[in-house]
């Protein structure tokens, strides 16, 4: 592949008639119809320069079957089936929150000028979208035939239209409410087509929002961007990193939504990381690294759960299984009933020659059903030789050089990000075909980033032991300020084990010596560990643990020669379930650098203290009698994508002690079941610690997938309310439930001296880019050393507390300061990160519920 080509636009920007902002009134109605248009009417110029790298025949049309979408029937990604509502349209939670109906904005903090990656959508005056229902007599089943028959009358409906086989959208109103026309099939059969006007839709209707997004996807296709998942990428402008066998496709995320005062396009830079090796290449390499009789089992563990890209159609699939009984010569039944081999199918359909005839077949299960209440289509059967691995392995993520070389291209500064986003908007304004499409629909986009004002909250004071510290808000960490200061609460280290291998004896002694140096300043009393040498085998570690760990053992430290997952998992599983004891695993090489060994020993000592029940630092929290709950989910790929929900709750006023439980859920289920059990246990733990009950409970719910908000409101919140009613007569605490979302495409830039910079930590945004039907806000809480900072979105879906928006926002920011694995401000409230760590440990390593005797400790850090 060649290096990255420079983008070039042709054509002149066309003048626009006087336009009005779309969505300047924020009236939304629940429920909408999903419009599904035809493909773009014409090809535009390439977005980016350079020759196309698709294979010959790669754009061939399917003859009744698309193998990558299952074998039973054709599946069209843009127009097929009923889509999940990823943006939770129609979920209006603010209407039930009386105290924020009039205003949901706060006022505390210093005003700061910001801009964001949003562009207003404008339309010509009195714009409307006209929706028609199309009937055929006699009935025509095939959607393509329906389209061909209708489009014989483009002189009536015009060339600008969107049609899904039943519903037609036009930018104009036909003369008659009901119009009848006649068409002929190729066989000469007469067909009567009845076109009935069913809706005249205003610009802000939910149906129009869906329509805008589909039209915008059409524009991206005109610019020759390829859809992969939900985003669009430019395969003709690749960034090649040959030293690591990686390729990056640059692209964009896009969505058009109703925000506070207008409908806007939100677009951000996205990068798709591909590997230069196919799945078959990976299997061959892996075969030479493993024992032959274990190959199938081991390679399945490596591949299942990974996402692959099929370049012949630029689609991605998750590998759910490997069918070792099939190979390219195996046959399957096509939609027309005929049988064909994989070999022949790929040759005819995509001009792809398969060379290895003994390779197995990858299986990818579909996620979406066909239509409302429909059945799942058959699995996609994929050939390893034609599938490219995407993303990074754990080994790559831990390789400093790989991540550094990737970051050069993917970690963009605010100004670089604005420039790339601006490049897309420039193309939209300069591409003749794109402008023609927009002009026909009567739509256009602003050229400039949206600007508005945000607020910077007051910097928090950190209390550690008897001392109080300020920190530099620009860096948002206090590792230097608190070094050498006593902790809030310490546990004496009297009875502990240090297990090491012979070659790590020096590192083990060095660790103990440095722990003796750093612990006195923390206030920790420490005795020398019981040191035990073991062979560097998993079984040897387990045997020593079984023989040496007793009820009096406070903590076990294992010094490991490498970060081998199987060894780590076995140690954690035994000490978290069979023999509940806090544990700390340390890779020996991290102790090898003399210049950092003291800092690492300090961090290890802090973690050990936390895991034994100690407390490090706190911030001022004016709210009293309040329990904070954090919930997050992890999908365990090794157990059929079973989900684990981590549940963490504060059990003291200072929010320095935490109770934890986890819940196992069915395959792919995101929303938590069994919340009652967790909350009841947490309230018992609170009562045991304080001898009274909390009067407020504030839940931060992370790990909610796009489109699941309605289920959360209707299903999970009632579980909390039912649980509180069951505690006892007369107990009626105030409840607040806040959905936390890290994966957002919104970016904010601070304007300083004519340059764009990252906003300072503590920046709150609750205007312009929030949703009118929600009680929501953004906070930029952390600082980043390079690239662009990502905000976190908070959506208060239930609240009978009566707390002001300022109080909720400031509490949320305070909670980002008390995560004990990092002496600084993190991106989400600490209970969310604790819940994530718990769910991750259980899903990655333990695969069972941890022993309940560990519930009151941060053993999962």
Curated annotation (Swiss-Prot):
Protein name per the record: Piwi-like protein 1
Keywords: Cytoplasm, Developmental protein, Differentiation, Disease variant, Endonuclease, Hydrolase, Magnesium, Meiosis, Metal-binding, Methylation, Nuclease, RNA-binding, RNA-mediated gene silencing, Spermatogenesis, Translation regulation, Ubl conjugation
Residues at the site labelled Required for binding 2'-O-methylated 3'-end of piRNAs: 381
Domain of life according to the entry: Eukaryota
Annotated PAZ domain residues: 278-391
Residue positions where Symmetric dimethylarginine is found in the record: 14, 53
Localization per record: Cytoplasm
Keyword presence, Disulfide bond: no
SMART domains found in the cross-reference section: GAGE, PAZ, Piwi
């Amino acid at each position: 592949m060649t290096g990255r080509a420079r983008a070039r636009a042709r054509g002149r920007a066309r003048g626009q008639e006087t336009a009005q902002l779309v969505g300047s009134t924020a009236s939304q109605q629940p429920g909408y119809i999903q419009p599904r248009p035809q493909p773009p009417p014409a090809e535009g110029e390439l977005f980016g320069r350079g020759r196309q790298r698709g294979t010959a025949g790669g754009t061939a049309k399917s003859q009744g079957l698309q193998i990558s979408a299952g074998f039973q029937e054709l599946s069209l990604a843009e127009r097929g089936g009923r889509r999940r509502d990823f943006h939770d349209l129609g979920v209006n939670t603010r209407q039930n929150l009386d105290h924020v109906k009039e205003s949901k904005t706060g006022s505390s903090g210093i005003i700061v000028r910001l801009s964001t990656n949003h562009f207003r959508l404008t339309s010509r005056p009195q714009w409307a979208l006209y929706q028609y229902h199309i009937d055929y007599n006699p009935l025509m089943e095939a959607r393509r035939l329906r389209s061909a028959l209708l489009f014989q009358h483009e002189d009536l409906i015009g060339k600008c239209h969107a049609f899904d086989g039943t519903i037609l959208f036009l930018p104009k109103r036909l003369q008659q409410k009901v119009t009848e026309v006649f068409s002929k099939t190729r066989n000469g059969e007469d067909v009567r087509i009845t076109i009935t006007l069913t809706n005249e839709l205003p610009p802000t209707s939910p149906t129009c929002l869906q329509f805008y997004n589909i039209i915008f996807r059409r524009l991206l296709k005109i610019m020759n961007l390829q859809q992969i998942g939900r985003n669009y990428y430019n395969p003709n402008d690749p960034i090649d990193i040959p030293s690591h066998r990686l390729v990056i496709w640059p692209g964009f995320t896009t969505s058009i939504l109703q925000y506070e005062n207008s409908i806007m396009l939100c677009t951000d830079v996205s990068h798709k990381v591909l590997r230069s090796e196919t799945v078959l290449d990976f299997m061959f390499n892996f075969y030479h690294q493993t024992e032959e009789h274990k190959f199938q089992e081991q390679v399945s563990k490596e591949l299942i759960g990974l996402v692959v890209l099929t370049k012949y159609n630029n689609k991605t699939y998750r590998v759910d299984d490997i069918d070792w009984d099939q190979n390219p010569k195996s046959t399957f039944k096509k939609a027309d009933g005929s049988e064909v081999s994989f070999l022949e199918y790929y040759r005819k359909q995509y001009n792809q020659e398969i060379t290895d005839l003994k390779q197995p077949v990858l299986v990818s299960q579909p996620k979406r059903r066909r239509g409302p209440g429909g059945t799942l289509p058959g699995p996609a059967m994929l050939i390893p030789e034609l599938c490219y691995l995407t993303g990074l392995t754990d080994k790559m993520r831990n390789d400093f050089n790989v991540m550094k070389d990737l970051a050069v291209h993917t970690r963009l500064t605010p100004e670089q990000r604005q420039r790339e986003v601006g490049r897309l908007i420039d193309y939209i304004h300069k591409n003749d075909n794109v402008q023609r499409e927009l002009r026909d629909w009567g739509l256009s986009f602003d050229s400039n980033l949206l600007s508005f004002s945000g607020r910077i909250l007051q910097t928090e004071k950190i209390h550690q032991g008897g001392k109080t510290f300020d920190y530099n808000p620009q860096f948002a960490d206090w590792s230097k300020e608190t070094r050498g200061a006593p902790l809030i609460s310490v546990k004496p280290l009297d009875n502990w084990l240090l297990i090491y291998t012979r070659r790590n004896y020096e590192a083990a002694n060095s660790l103990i010596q440095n722990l003796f140096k750093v612990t006195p300043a923390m206030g920790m009393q420490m005795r020398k560990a019981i040191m035990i040498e073991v062979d560097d085998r998993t079984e040897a570690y387990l045997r020593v643990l079984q023989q040496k760990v007793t009820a009096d053992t406070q903590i076990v430290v294992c010094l490991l020669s490498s970060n081998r997952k199987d060894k780590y998992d076995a140690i954690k599983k035994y000490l978290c379930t069979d023999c509940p004891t806090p544990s700390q695993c340390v890779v020996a090489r991290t102790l090898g650098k003399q210049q950092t060994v003291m800092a690492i020993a300090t961090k290890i000592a802090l973690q050990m203290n936390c895991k034994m029940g100690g407390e490090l630092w706190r911030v001022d929290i004016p709210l009293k009698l309040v329990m904070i709950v954090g919930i997050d989910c992890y999908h365990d790929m090794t157990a059929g994508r079973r989900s684990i929900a981590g549940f963490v709750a504060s059990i003291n006023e200072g929010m320095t002690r935490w109770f934890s439980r986890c819940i196992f859920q069915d395959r792919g289920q995101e929303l938590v079941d069994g919340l009652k059990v967790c909350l009841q246990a947490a309230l018992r733990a609170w009562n045991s610690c304080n001898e009274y009950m909390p009067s407020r409970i504030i839940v931060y719910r992370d790990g909610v997938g796009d489109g699941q908000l309605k289920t959360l409101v209707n299903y999970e919140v009632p579980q909390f309310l039912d649980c509180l009613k069951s505690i006892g007569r007369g107990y009626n605490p105030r409840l607040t439930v806040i959905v936390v979302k890290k994966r957002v495409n919104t970016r904010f830039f601070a304007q300083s001296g004519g340059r764009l910079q990252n906003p300072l930590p503590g920046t709150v945004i609750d205007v312009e880019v929030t949703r009118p039907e929600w009680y929501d806000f953004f906070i930029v809480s952390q600082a980043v050393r390079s690239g662009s900072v990502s905000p976190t979105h908070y959506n208060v879906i239930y609240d009978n507390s009566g707390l002001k928006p300022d109080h909720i926002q400031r509490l949320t920011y305070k909670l980002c300061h008390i995560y004990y694995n990092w002496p600084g401000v993190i991106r989400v409230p600490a209970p969310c990160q604790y819940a994530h760590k718990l769910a991750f440990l259980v899903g990655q390593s333990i695969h069972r519920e941890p022993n309940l005797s560990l519930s009151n400790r941060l053993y999962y850090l």
